UniProtKB/Swiss-Prot annotation:
Disulfide topology: C29-C39, C89-C94, C184-C185, C409-C447
Signal sequence, renumbered to the chain: 1-26
Encoding gene (name): abfB
Record remark on domains: Organized into two domains: an N-terminal catalytic domain and a C-terminal arabinose-binding domain (ABD).
GO process terms (BP): arabinan catabolic process; arabinose metabolic process; L-arabinose metabolic process; pectin catabolic process; xylan catabolic process
CDD domains, per database record: beta-trefoil_ABD_ABFB
One Pfam family this sequence matches: AbfB
Ranges for region Catalytic: 27-343
Catalytic activity: Hydrolysis of terminal non-reducing alpha-L-arabinofuranoside residues in alpha-L-arabinosides
UniProt-listed Enzyme Commission number(s): 3.2.1.55
Name of protein: Probable alpha-L-arabinofuranosidase B
């Protein structure tokens, strides 16, 4: 793999002077270095984590021609150049192919290979993340995080300088505390080099979610826990630590660190306030965790054995050499707060109004008289006009509702079957009654953006943002621009996912 220049780093203390002579506040990895526990891996799609870093943050690949480009900070130590991504990806889709390591060690994260579990992509690889699934702003500047859907994962099984055996290390990640599930396992950190489960104590990674198969904290979750392999741990007990609270800050700082027979969990609101310690003590009281047998691979969004059931959103994170002090981590947290993470719009293009009734017309040349409709639970396209029957007009009419899982997006309720919504199931769109579950809410939430073919809107799945409303043989799917399903075919994709929205027929 050819990698670009620019991976040099500057080690500074409280402040760094960059080439222009401008005084720049220390980044997280500068702070860790000054504390004697330097970063050995530093990953972020949103910003530079060293004050002098000007190299690439991540790479995107576009669907139109397979070309790639690297996205760098706007300036040394700065926020990602999201405008460069937006320009490169205009009128097509983009995936995040590489998350570069800013530490200089080359510990880049790429598409995770198959392991104990296979991913959904060709040859058992995991999916890559959409480049636009997690927009944010940092100090008012737009950037994109990494939105992990089940099946998506990144990995490096040949990392350099990461902790092995019982060696000390620390790690933090900034996550979306509202995006999680109970699947295994949304992790960031140290894992097996074989992508298989090699036994207790062979991992040390941050976990976030509400899985209760192993450990848990207080309340109903989600929790920050440590994935130490064959267990998600909230403390010394293999089960519950009441001191590990449920946390759902929109921006969440999560910390795990470990050294011989001592480890800790810490957390905070990444937008304000200071860190709290949720656990600090001995290793779990089960065999295999003291001493640890860490292997030093790096994972994001998956379990050590490539378990792919989890979801979450990652903005930035690092791994260190040595066990960071609380004081060092407190300074890192202050830096994260100063970055001023904030939400950004999830939609673009023609606006929708909650409570309005709409119809959606296909724009593919074959099908411009066809509208998105349903026949029972099947969502399809049908030829509809002003002279159509009242029943057909109603089948092709939809009420716009606030997104059931995220009110920044939308859900679409059937006009003739109130209480039933368009949702995806196995990536087939269907009309289903709202059963009130978190899964239904997520599967029925969609985010319109400017139409990929320049007409109307393309309607993106909120929880699988690589996937869009697509008509294929007149049936509706949540389809990606290329993939393993027949309905993911790249031919006419932009046309098939672009819809002109109008006032409803009924």
């Amino acid at each position: 793999m050819l990698l670009p220049r620019g991976f040099n780093r500057a080690v500074v203390t409280a402040l760094g002077v960059v080439g222009t002579g401008t005084l720049v506040a220390a980044g997280p990895c500068d702070i860790y270095s000054s504390g004697g526990t330097p970063c050995v891996a530093a990953h972020s799609t949103t910003r530079a984590l060293y004050s002098a870093y000007t190299g690439p943050l991540y790479q995107v690949k576009r669907g139109s021609d397979g070309a790639t480009t690297n996205i760098a900070p706007l300036s040394a130590g700065g926020v990602a150049n999201a405008a460069a991504q937006d320009s490169f990806c205009a009128g097509t889709t983009c995936l995040i192919t590489i998350i570069y390591d800013q530490s200089g060690r080359g510990n880049h994260l790429t598409q995770a290979p198959p392991g104990g579990f296979k991913g959904p992509e060709a040859n058992g690889y995991d999916n890559l993340a959409s480049a636009i699934g997690a927009p944010v702003t940092l100090n008012g500047q737009k950037a994109y995080g990494v939105f992990i859907s089940p099946g998506t994962g990144y990995r490096n099984n040949a990392a350099s300088g990461t902790a092995t055996g019982d060696a000390p290390e620390g790690m933090y990640a900034v996550l979306d505390g509202t995006h999680y599930n109970g699947g295994c396992c949304f992790d960031y950190g140290n894992a097996e080099t074989s992508s298989t489960d090699t036994g207790n104590g062979h991992m040390e990674a941050i976990y976030f979610g509400d899985n209760t198969v192993w450990g848990s904290g207080s309340g109903s979750g989600p929790w920050i826990m440590a994935d130490l392999e064959n267990g998600l741990f909230s403390g010394s007990s293999t089960k519950n630590n009441a001191g590990d609270p449920s946390v759902s800050y929109r921006f969440l700082t999560a910390i795990v660190k470990g050294k011989p027979n001592q480890w800790a969990i810490r957390g905070a609101n990444a937008a304000s306030g200071s860190l709290s310690t949720y656990y600090n003590g001995a290793r779990p009281n089960a065999s295999g965790y003291n001493p640890m047998s860490k292997e030093g691979a790096i994972i994001l969004g998956i379990g050590g054995d490539n378990s792919i059931g989890a979801q979450g959103t990652f903005y930035e994170g690092v791994m260190t050499s040595g066990y960071p002090s609380d004081a060092t981590e407190n300074s890192v947290q202050a830096n994260i707060v100063a970055a001023k993470y904030a939400v950004a719009p999830l939609t673009s293009g023609p606006s929708l109004t909650v409570g309005s009734s709409i119809s959606l017309r296909a724009t593919t040349s074959c099908c411009t008289t066809r509208y998105l409709a349903h026949n029972g639970s099947t969502v399809n396209t049908q030829v509809v006009s002003s002279s159509s029957s009242t029943a057909l007009k109603q089948q092709a009419s939809w009420t716009v509702r606030a997104g059931l899982a995220n009110s920044a997006c939308f859900s679409f309720e059937s006009k003739d079957t109130p209480g039933s919504f368009i949702r995806h199931y196995d990536f087939v769109l269907q009309l289903s009654a709202n059963d009130g579950t978190k899964q239904f809410y997520e599967d029925a939430t969609f985010c319109p953006q400017s139409g990929l073919n320049g007409q109307g809107s393309s309607i993106r799945s909120w929880n699988y943002p690589t996937r869009y409303f697509r008509h294929y043989n007149n049936v509706l799917y949540a389809a990606s621009n290329g993939g393993v399903h027949t309905f993911d075919a790249t031919g006419s994709f932009n046309d098939d996912v672009s819809w002109v929205v109008s006032t409803s027929f009924a």
